[in-house]
């Protein structure tokens, strides 16, 4: 979900400083009406509040579909992907959105998108058999090329990630008892299924959740993590060699049901990670729905003060050591201590969240909702 584009060092420093001050204000300042900031509230029915510093500002998309795929390129540029084969792109900070959906894709369900810049993006459609596809564009969505169409009836692809502009992976629910991994080394132009010998067996009923495009995430040149649910325990699988071999670790996030498990991961380094999830059913509680790892995903512990409900998306705020955002149907939470404790600061519904290197943080979800984090 994260864009590959980079910004200049000075811009990073300024953005990081503003971020730290603003997020601290979010946690310590009194709530105030969104109208005070002169923008539209991102919460439900206008009931959401902005606190001192930052808040979500809705960026009307003109669409009614659900956007579970999101790639933040910068504060000005973002891509979203969703149901009914819909892909939108903004290059003016969300003031307008161009419909750049692939022709003839109306029956596809896009759940993940990776953008390298304002021109190049790779989008994943999910579903059984041929419904799982990968498409790519190099001209801002004017034209699209189908790069992969699944021909295994039992495969169901959930998420996609890139290490850089050339190398990436996609993951499918288990086939013959093991997760299936696709690999590309040419920016998504071609894909191959990796050997399964290095993949540990899946648990009975275990699968990934195509809820936010964050069930498969990477950091650096070769580390990648895979989130699971539906089995007896919610696990995180880790590969240090771009998907050739994997190790599995149990998390304390509740599982044991097809609706429960780890829905999203975020790693700010090879060692420091956050997992969020829970039970996506609105009438079921989600205690212990967030966990942290300090050893690259080998071990996980429940947050001392977890997110208050099911969360489907999570992202680190760039250029900080301990600030992250988590989103779900009932709101947004922020942590300033690396995931140990979380505090809610918005009640609007979002499925996924992503931050660019220049501190352009975006969120998207149901009914065409897209927002950017702003003062």
Where are these regions (language model features)?
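Residue-level hotspots at or immediately adjacent to binding/recognition sites across diverse folds
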Residues: 46-375
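Secretory targeting and sorting signals
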Residues: 2-35
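Exposed boundary/loop context
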Residues: 10, 22, 38, 205-206, ...
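N-terminal low-complexity, Pro/Thr-rich disordered segments
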Residues: 27-57
């Amino acid at each position: 979900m994260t864009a590959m584009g980079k910004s200049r060092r000075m811009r990073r420093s300024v953005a990081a400083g503003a971020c730290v001050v603003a997020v601290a204000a979010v946690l310590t300042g009194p709530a105030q009406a969104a109208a005070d900031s002169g923008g539209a509230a991102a919460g439900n029915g206008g009931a959401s509040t902005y606190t001192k510093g930052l808040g979500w500002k809705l960026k009307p998309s003109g669409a009614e579909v659900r956007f579970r795929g999101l790639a933040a390129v910068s504060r000005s540029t973002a891509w979203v992907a969703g149901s009914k084969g819909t892909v939108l792109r903004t290059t003016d900070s969300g003031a307008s959105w161009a419909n750049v959906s692939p022709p003839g894709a109306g029956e596809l369900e896009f759940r993940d998108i990776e953008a390298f810049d304002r021109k190049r993006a790779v989008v994943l459609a999910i579903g059984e058999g041929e419904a799982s596809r990968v498409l790519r564009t190099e001209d801002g969505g004017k034209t699209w090329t189908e790069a992969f169409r699944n021909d295994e009836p039992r495969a169901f692809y959930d998420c996609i990630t890139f290490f850089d502009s050339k190398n990436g992976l996609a993951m499918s629910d288990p086939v013959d008892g093991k997760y299936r991994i696709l690999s590309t080394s040419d920016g998504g132009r071609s894909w191959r299924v990796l050997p399964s010998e290095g993949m540990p067996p899946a648990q009975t009923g275990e699968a990934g959740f195509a809820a936010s495009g964050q069930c498969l995430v990477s950091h650096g040149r070769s580390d990648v993590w895979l989130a699971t649910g539906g089995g007896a325990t919610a696990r995180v699988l880790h590969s240090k060699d771009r998907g050739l071999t994997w190790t599995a670790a149990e998390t304390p996030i509740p599982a044991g049901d097809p609706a429960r498990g780890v829905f999203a991961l975020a790693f700010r380094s090879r060692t420091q990670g956050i997992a969020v999830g829970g039970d996506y059913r609105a009438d079921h509680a989600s205690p212990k729905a967030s966990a942290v790892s300090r050893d690259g995903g080998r071990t996980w512990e429940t947050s001392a003060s977890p997110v208050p409900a099911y969360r489907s998306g999570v992202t680190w705020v760039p250029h900080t050591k301990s600030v992250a955002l988590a989103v779900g149907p009932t709101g947004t939470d922020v942590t300033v201590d690396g995931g140990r404790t979380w505090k809610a600061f918005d009640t609007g519904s979002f499925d996924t969240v992503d931050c660019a290197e220049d501190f352009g943080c975006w969120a998207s979800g149901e009914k065409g909702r897209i927002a950017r984090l702003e003062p």
